[in-house]
Amino acid sequence: MEKGVYIIGTSTDIGKTFISGLILKKLREEGRNAGYYKAVLSGAIKDKKGLIPLDCEEVMEISGLKESYENMVSYILENPYSPHLASEVEEVSISMEKIKKDYKSVRDKYDFILCEGSGGIVCPISFSEKKLMLEDIIKEFNLPIILVSNSGLGAINHTVLTVSYLRNLGLKVKGIILNKFNKSDIIHRDNKKIIKELTGVNNISTVPKIEDIEKYDLNELNEVLYGI
């Protein structure tokens, strides 16, 4: 298995943070020394102690990982905008060198790194000073991608287009996860079949709407992680 994966979504609010937490939980329960990293996080909540990155909180709560925010995220922004706009409004300069340095620190501490992207693949990280896209970070880290999509109407279009775009960039798609999958829904079942045929991606896992994480069988993720 690779030394890490990059989790991205077909769009924002698709559930990639929740999925990141599930994957990290599985890896850690298997005995892997697995950590989490996100280059830029926007939409943090401000309290008396500063900015609270909710994505990190969610991942730690699900996975059991205990880590400081500064070791998980390079840039924490308050406004719930695309990273390039949030950083511009908050007058924060995004540096690829800092991102590379922080990622190396996480990589030195953990054997496996689960990186989470910001939104979909066409996501500007910085635009006003020097243009930096999410794809640039993924290329720099040289990690395969797990793509998270919804399971309902629109999933075929969004997923196939994203996979095509990723391949045009020369990025490796390790697998696909269809989130909030309902086995009794004919649309969901058909979407999985058509997506597999149109993309040629064989490693597709499904995650249902989960009320109690402890009751979820993490082995359902084996296909996307291990191809079994």
From Swiss-Prot:
One of its GO terms (biological process) is biotin biosynthetic process. Its cofactor is Mg(2+). GO terms for molecular function: ATP binding; dethiobiotin synthase activity; magnesium ion binding. Pathway: Cofactor biosynthesis; biotin biosynthesis; biotin from 7,8-diaminononanoate: step 1/2. Keywords: ATP-binding, Biotin biosynthesis, Cytoplasm, Ligase, Magnesium, Metal-binding, Nucleotide-binding. Substrate binds at S42. PANTHER family: ATP-DEPENDENT DETHIOBIOTIN SYNTHETASE BIOD 2, DETHIOBIOTIN SYNTHETASE. This is ATP-dependent dethiobiotin synthetase BioD.
